[in-house]
């Protein structure tokens, strides 16, 4: 019914879906800024809280009407449990991490089962955190076109070194074999992982390194 009401806007847009227990919102905003820097017409729906199917489809419809050609959406496990994303064509599905300490409303087993539903939707490209302790579990998830990884142990995006400051973070990474230096106003070690994830997503979408660096620098996290 929602599809008949809102139409099928995703047929004209690339859909980037970002999931994981932490960092979804930060990565979504990083990717949003990167794609804006590259000249794409992009819209973002980012929240750690689950949202309803009606809200998602209205967002997609509004983004399409506004001329977006890429949409970025965070994917809480609770929304996957309610089949909110059922039937949507996913261009990129990315996993930030799986931290059991962050789970409050489901068991680790239930969470993994929810996450599996996203990657079972046959996304064109899958981006995974090679540093995550549960990487071997998620390594079974494959994109129909390509599967990429990131992290200090990553092969596609490899974190070479980083510097942490009270009000920001710098990192040097190899992205598809090209060495780039990134800087963000987000402090903390996790910022390095989130930048790496966003860089992998952007590179998967064909964004050049200059725009990745510019977009990362543009994101201003809330205090």
Predicted regions and their residues:
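Phosphate-binding loop of NTP-binding sites
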Residues: 2-130, 134-145, 202-205
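Adenine nucleotide phosphate-binding catalytic loops in nucleotide-utilizing enzymes
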Residues: 105-112, 116, 144-223
